[in-house]
A protein has these predicted regions:
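Hydrophobic residues on short alpha-helical segments
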Residues: 23, 32-38
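Conserved segment of winged-helix/HTH DNA-binding domains
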Residues: 80-114
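Short capping segments at the starts of secondary-structure elements
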Residues: 29-31, 40-47
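Glycine-centered, phosphate/nucleic-acid-interacting loop/turn motifs that mediate DNA/RNA or nucleotide
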Residues: 70
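Short, Lys/Arg-enriched N-terminal segment that forms or immediately precedes the first helix
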Residues: 4-24
Length: 114
């Protein structure tokens, strides 16, 4: 008896492949800029948005996606004078190599040893 579900296509498989999601994050202009703006120093969302001249919502969206992929981490929390807790982000990678050939993609990530 054949399987009940049809065999997924290559595109359907890649859609959920972690490599594919990392490649998408690294090649999206906003995410790429956000990620590599916090390689050498930790920053909060406002600092990143101001430095890159992008909206806060785009910055939050990029950081949320990068954090889900474990490409950034919350380095620490900064407490403001009025008691607000601010997340300080740092990139977990300092470099990435992407290789794509035929039906195969490969991502090599280099850790950020800060």
């Amino acid at each position: 008896m054949k399987g009940i579900l049809p065999k997924p296509t290559l595109l359907e498989l890649d859609e959920y492949d972690i490599n594919q999601r990392v490649i998408e994050a690294l090649t999206t202009t906003c995410s790429h800029a956000v990620l590599f703006s916090i390689v050498n120093v930790e920053k909060d969302v406002v600092e990143i948005a101001n430095e890159l001249q992008i909206s806060l919502s785009s910055t939050y969206k990029a950081l949320t996606n990068l954090e889900k992929l474990s490409l950034v981490e919350i380095q620490r929390f900064k407490i403001t004078d009025d008691g607000k807790k601010i997340k300080m982000y740092r990139s977990r990678i300092k470099k990435a190599d992407i290789s794509i050939n035929e039906n195969n993609s490969k991502v090599l990530l280099y850790p950020n040893n800060y």
